Amino acid sequence: MQEEKQGLPMQIRKPRSFEDVEEIINCFKQKMTVIVYVNELNNSTALRVVDILSGAIYALGGGMAELERDMYIFNPDGVTAK
């Protein structure tokens, strides 16, 4: 059983293009929780961004959830949003 970690850093990101995805994935690698707003992207780009980020966080053992329309939270392995 994994212990829940508290007090980890959090980032809030608003990607403006698909090219911003790599920077967000680097936050995942540093075990940061990241809230991502995709409301400034067109629908097809927003879908691509969320698909790539969800695959990346899954590959790193973390998880994600939709908080509201166009807002997602990505948690590293061992961190649960409350």
Please place each PLM-identified region on the residue numbering.
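Short basic, glycine-rich beta-strand/loop surfaces that mediate nucleic-acid
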Residues: 49-61, 65-82
